[in-house]
Amino acid sequence: MYVEKILQSLQKKYPYQKEFHQAVYEAITSLKPLLDSDKSYEKHAVLERLIEPEREIFFRVCWLDDNHQIQVNRGCRVEFNSAIGPYKGGLRFHPSVNESVIKFLGFEQVLKNSLTTLAMGGAKGGSDFDPKEKSEHEIMRFCQAFMNELYRHIGATTDVPAGDIGVGEREIGYLFGQYKKLVNRFEGVLTGKGLTYGGSLCRKEATGYGCVYFAEEMLQERNSSLEGKVCSVSGSGNVAIYTIEKLLQIGAKPVTASDSNGMIYDKDGIDLELLKEIKEARRGRIKEYALEKTSAKYTPTENYPKGGNAIWHVPCFAAFPSATENELSVLDAKTLLSNGCKCVAEGANMPSSNEAIELFLQAKISYGIGKAANAGGVSVSGLEMAQNASMHPWSFEVVDAKLHHIMKEIYKNVSQTAKEFKDPTNFVLGANIAGFRKVASAMIAQGV
């Protein structure tokens, strides 16, 4: 009854925040075995407090475009929970950004950061600003205007933002530069920085590498591996590119990539250098890949199956949804399973619908939910914070080894928790309960 009461209250209070509802529903319904066995969580109103952000900050961002016209966007930062450490979570610049999207991402971040073993609370922020087709100067002016409003709410031991969709190293650089001018301090207030001013080696690789490490841990328990296996990866940003890179390093065969306009299937396996050239150097579109590789076929989004994504209709052993939320529907899940998919590891946040997740759990495949499988990114952000605090950078090998260890520990925690609650293949339950218990314990200990 406790979970049902919370969900009803949420629906009544925020009726139009469908992404936030989806994230909360997925998480707290899997907490039922824990909540039924321990009534102290209800006594201390932990769920009520957990789903309500500690602070929501919204602000106007005014900036000048290249035609000297004033443009106005909306910026926000949702500081969700600081029970186990300073707020930590990315900034997203995309037209889809609204309160519901940022709250879902912030809520997910709380549980994800809890799993990392590092002392980080959860937050998320961003703007409805679209960096696509903007000039370098327009992006710089927007970032400076955004930081003019955000700077008073963040700090190295208060709230440490990072990048997300639409916010890469370039944007982080502009944001950091403006923060430094405003406060006259050089401190680790942002992660994802360039290597010459406090960034960490292995940061851009971290989410993708970590996702593959987690998938390998899941498969190892079943006496299997990714070596020699065909893999489908969606997206073509940092997460997708470095998922593909790590898959190639371990001998797997990634055959797909995508962007908002369509997807490519390369029967010979993805040419990583070409993909990096198109997406990182040129900032081009994925269709350019098919123009340069005769082995590749391009499918535009208008030709995708109704209610589905063409990328998940390519037969594969393992799928790595690494683009955006709700990119993998129940139709896609059915298709993946019927084509023999044995492993799904989520590089993106909430890429699978709740109905798709149910199918994966029923099929008992190796399914790594995003808050566990993609926690490598924020883990290395935490390691960047540690390097900034000590003013001592670490080598790529040291950071990668620490990342690999953290992903192993996350898997171990998730797997042991699932076994504790008599559902050993349910890593959704394992991840949510393991993440929740740590945060809840800290919340109860610190009082109301």
UniProtKB/Swiss-Prot annotation:
EC number: 1.4.1.4
Subunit structure: Homohexamer.
Site feature Important for catalysis, where: D164
KW Acetylation (keyword) present: no
Family: Belongs to the Glu/Leu/Phe/Val dehydrogenases family.
Gene: gdhA
GO (cellular component) term, any one: cytosol
Catalytic activity: L-glutamate + NADP(+) + H2O = 2-oxoglutarate + NH4(+) + NADPH + H(+)
UniProtKB keywords: NADP, Oxidoreductase
Name the UniProt record assigns to this protein: NADP-specific glutamate dehydrogenase
One of the GO BP terms on file: glutamate biosynthetic process
CDD domains, alphabetized: NAD_bind_2_Glu_DH
Annotated residues for binding of substrate: K88, Q109, K112, G163, S381
Free-text function comment from the UniProt entry: Catalyzes the reversible oxidative deamination of glutamate to alpha-ketoglutarate and ammonia.
Source species, domain of life: Bacteria
Chain residues that bind NADP(+): T207, N238
One Gene Ontology term of the molecular function aspect: glutamate dehydrogenase (NADP+) activity
Residues at the active site: K124
InterPro entries cross-referenced by the UniProt entry: Aminoacid_DH-like_N_sf, Glu/Leu/Phe/Val/Trp_DH, Glu/Leu/Phe/Val/Trp_DH_C, Glu/Leu/Phe/Val/Trp_DH_dimer, Glu/Leu/Phe/Val_DH_AS, Glu_DH, Glu_Leu_Phe_Val_DH, NAD(P)-bd_dom_sf
Group of enzyme by EC: oxidoreductase
Organism: Helicobacter pylori (strain J99 / ATCC 700824) (Campylobacter pylori J99)
